[in-house]
Amino acid sequence: MLRRVSFAVLLVLAPAGVARAQSLRDQIRTDLFTFGNCGEPLCLAGSLGAHGGHFIPSDTSSSGSMLTLLGTALSQSVSNVPVSATSAGVTYSFVGGLPVKTSTSGGPIFGERAQTLGKGRWFIGANVTAMNFQRLRGIPMNEVTFNFTHADVSPSGPTPNDTLGSPEFENDVVQVKLALNISVLVTTFVASYGLVDGVDLSVAVPVVHTSVQGTSVATIIPFDFPTPHFFAGDATNPVLTAVSGMDGSASGLGDISARLKVNVVQSGDFGVSVLGDARFPTGDENNLLGAGAFSGRGLAIASARFGTITPHLNFGYAFRDAKFANNSILATGGFDNQLSGWATMAFELMSEWELGASKLKIPGVVHYLAPFPHTVTPTNIPDQQDNFLNASMGFKFQTPKGILITTNALFPLRNSGLEPAVVWTSGLEYSF
């Protein structure tokens, strides 16, 4: 058995291919925001002289921030796919050298219960999670809009002018409307082992496939005519609209996690444990396969048993080392109900609450001073904290061979971050 498990892990860890040499983040930046043959995002190939480069993100900090926002939100959402519990099915403790059952139900699906496996026992599982992202902070993925503003250029000469809006062409805006279809398929292999009675060590290895298709429609909104900004044509007959698109995918190893659970208190019907979870940046952030930085969780776990119903509470703290990710408070509550000897229903409310102002910043409103005071809002994406609340409901069915078949649906309840309408999970679990 160990030989087969080792071989499977080696296959998972083998380098996975990427559909294109260019990373998905680069494709989003270049393919969706490059129009014409200029070769740079927001470069206006048809414009006269230096005017073609006045919207390039490297020259306009707010434009660069918006492209960073989109790519970072994508990679963080992919890396936050929930991982199944460290144990499932029947668990044991040893009393007088003999194994005694501490649980008989199938257990929770994503939350943790206090019981551990028991010394020398194994839990292995594999599940597949599928999602299609539908909204970004509540904005539908086919309605995301960016307004890219002109760089504040100072005309040459003896009287330079640093007032934004003067000359008048600085008031021109390039509006880009996106329609994105982003799908993620995660296959996760989990193995847990009872080091001693009351202490479990677990490893979760995800393999991620991310697919991104999108179209973008860019429109130059001139403040006045004639305008020096256009995609094609000339100042007399300017072409002010352009379309671009992308279709890319990537597959590979996600962020591997290692977890250690220690049972502190365990009676017949009540238990308390603590869990430490470390996620390592083994997934390629640029291809939207991982977070690109270390993260860790610490949880306090309490669970009880009332007949066939086993409630559990998890409360803890998440640390994230990524530049644009916040630390957060974690809270999960739920129960599993043994419907029969072979079927268990599980329900959970899972939440995550950011600490401090969100590091994933929306560029601020741009204020113009000329020819009259006015403002431009860079995007319709709200500037807010990303606090998550999800409802999860699923079932576990035990086969005559002792294998658990898991099905689950998770529903986001808040408009935070990049979210799907539903997250589907199915898998197999086995304890021995």
What name fits each language-model region?
Residues 22-204, 208-250, 254, 361, ...:
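A subset of solvent-exposed loop/turn segments in beta-rich extracellular surface proteins, enriched
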Residues 106, 110-113, 124-128, 189-193, ...:
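Residues on the lipid-exposed face of transmembrane beta-strands in outer-membrane beta-barrel proteins
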Residues 106, 118-120, 182-187, 251-256, ...:
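Residues that define the transmembrane beta-barrel architecture of outer-membrane proteins
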Residues 110-111, 173-177, 242-247, 283-288, ...:
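Extracellular loop and loop/strand-boundary signature of outer-membrane beta-barrel proteins
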Residues 133, 199-203, 267-271, 308-313, ...:
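Repeated loop/turn-to-beta-strand initiation elements of outer-membrane beta-barrel proteins
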Residues 136-141, 214-220, 274-277, 284-292, ...:
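Outer-membrane beta-barrel translocator domains and adjoining extracellular loop/strand segments
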Residues 143-149, 154-156, 225-242, 325, ...:
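Outer membrane beta-barrel transmembrane domains
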